[in-house]
């Protein structure tokens, strides 16, 4: 699964996800993409599950690009532990996804296969998404 090799700090504040995506809202690599339409934290496991669903439907044809990276550490305390005594340990890594962000791109397959693959991948994600197609400009 995806996670940073090293970070400046081990733990982060939760924070909020405000506004629209400032970058990564255009198709840069493939002809079809999966665009988020709402803000959410997407875990590394969810990204991996979506990637597997997409590549499995494409049957190793074409190419997949993952455009989000889980760089936010999410902490949790063990079960049945009293409050206090410091922040919990890092449980998993997540990516903060803003509305408009392209999460996955694919290319090298027909439009019907691409749409179905992205639909299956979108089912694994906690965000509302829409499929975008590169217009030939």
Swiss-Prot record:
Name of protein: Large ribosomal subunit protein uL16
Presence of the UniProt keyword Transmembrane helix in the record: no
Subunit structure: Part of the 50S ribosomal subunit.
Keywords, ordered alphabetically: Ribonucleoprotein, Ribosomal protein, RNA-binding, rRNA-binding, tRNA-binding
GO biological process: translation
Family in the record: Belongs to the universal ribosomal protein uL16 family.
Pfam family, one: Ribosomal_L16
GO cellular component, one term: cytosolic large ribosomal subunit
Function description: Binds 23S rRNA and is also seen to make contacts with the A and possibly P site tRNAs.
Taxonomic lineage of the native organism: Bacteria, Pseudomonadati, Pseudomonadota, Alphaproteobacteria, Rhodobacterales
Ribosomal protein among keywords: yes
Family matches, as InterPro entries: Ribosomal_uL16 (IPR047873), Ribosomal_uL16_bact-type (IPR000114), Ribosomal_uL16_CS (IPR020798), Ribosomal_uL16_dom (IPR016180), Ribosomal_uL16_sf (IPR036920)
Domain of life: Bacteria
SUPFAM superfamilies: Ribosomal protein L16p/L10e (SSF54686)
Molecular function GO labels: rRNA binding; structural constituent of ribosome; tRNA binding
